């Protein structure tokens, strides 16, 4: 296995599923399951709380490509208890710390590649982390018009108020309106 394929899957997972880093490292392939004719990611998260998140076609495509690269069937059977993210050297899983370090390495390289042309974006990107992708996923979900109750369930937040923190559309409108004020 090479880093590219694992990283491609990892970044799809981080952005499209909004997981906590511990969820990324602790789950097996069969946590992606067909339920009532649709694919979901079944998660045991913070506080041992069970949750499920819809797996979009894009997420399934990334999962299938990653699994095929590993020499596995495109979609995981129920008995596939192998780690969701594998070490480069074989079938063992990787730790939450390794997931975090891998993300930091990739975003640092990406930031470095745009630094000359776009130093402000580079400095923002350099600060990205696994949790940043979780926040970004929920924020972009809100921007895309996904209902707050679905965002709350996908983020596995106890309270809808926690998820509401990620709603920035009002700030954007306010900022745009404020531009009308001229000296």
Predicted regions, residues:
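Conserved catalytic core of the tyrosine transesterase superfamily
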Residues: 1-183
